[in-house]
Amino acid sequence: MSIFNRFIGATAAFLMFIGATQVSADTIKIGVLHSLSGTMAISETTLKDTMLMLIEDQNKKGGVLGKKLEAVVVDPASNWPLFAEKARGLIEKDKVDVIFGCWTSVSRKSVLPVIEELNSVFFYPVQYEGEESSKNVFYTGAAPNQQAIPAVDYLMNEIGVERWVLAGTDYVYPRTTNKILKAYLTAKGVSESDIMINYTPFGHSDWQTIVSDIKKFGSAGKQTAVVSTINGDANVPFYKELGNQGLSASDIPVVAFSVGEEELSGLDTGPLVGHLAAWNYFMSADAEENEVFIEKWKKFIKDKKRVTNDPMEAHYIGFNMWVKAVEKAGTTEPEAVQDALIGVTTPNLTGGVSAMMPNHHITKPVLIGEIQADGQFDIVSSTDGLVAGDAWSDFLPGSKDLIADWRTPLSCGNYNVKTGKCSGQNY
């Protein structure tokens, strides 16, 4: 090959490289970190689709800062260490500007050190146990004071529940939430003998003995309820076994924190009518914004039978907040976006306007829904206004004096109001 031809070839290759770099730079990359396989796929696949819809819709509006948005989708496969590996790849290899993802707290805890080390921006869309506030994470799901505590109050005040079964999957979210609930119930005068706690592994399928134990526990003459933090596809055999053993909502009502419209779509809901769920959004919410969202979702997914649920709304809120913050900051640079997000407001899907608080949690209504035969929820209770999420529980001794405030000059995730000190680690 002649020197001239080599020069032409090298020049062409260089120009192709520059062109590819420019194309890449002309998009803003969004990481989508949700399980598309494994035990959590039943819940998380829909959240991946939600993000693709939101990104497509924003691109139709012109994108952000004059650039199109590009989704980078990965599958951590319900494998908790793999979440961290995939998150690192999204930031270091794919150069994403923000990540939306996770469902379980164990996956979030796996991702968190990576997000902080590489100083990225992460939106977490699912209810969780609290006891955490990171500068890099924005929690658009419910904290315990926005779901678990109000659900217990409803069961206690409206149904007269006196005995409590705290049933959960064996990982950090159910264990910490139940620790908070046990402390709360004890403070309300409930005896320890009236509290039953049970944990099962992810994907648990044999519920016969456990449901039988619940039935026996509820036969002591006091109104009994199950507070469920069971996650993933284990919910399907759990509810089936309730039906098999004839446990109806009038006998022992179940209030679930991780069962919504998507999970019910795979069940025979007949035996489940009357059981409850506590969320901040239901598909049945009567609001114009919700009608528009549902119509857009069904058109995007090309299936009129597909439902919407609470974590989808959380992604809707979080994504719109991120767009506003980036436009406000004029950049996708992480620290500028983190600062710009505080105070950002956006309409939610229940008719209100949610705000991002200094502790990186948002304001949300609290709703209790009753399962109907068609797999939808009848909203039987709702707060008068929006409730701000607490990062730290008022009912745990080590947390009740802590607050999170990421505004300068405090800029702390666990500031002790009694000692006036920031403890450093935020989780």
Language model features with spans:
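Sec/Tat signal peptide C-region and signal peptidase I cleavage site
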Residues: 19-25
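Extracytoplasmic "Venus flytrap"
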Residues: 31-50, 74-81, 103-106, 170-175, ...
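Extracellular/periplasmic Venus flytrap/periplasmic-binding protein
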Residues: 85, 129-130, 136-245, 284-292, ...
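Periplasmic-binding protein-like
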Residues: 90-102, 123-125, 163-168, 220-232, ...
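Extracellular/periplasmic periplasmic-binding protein-like sensory domains
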Residues: 241-316, 326-332, 383-414, 423
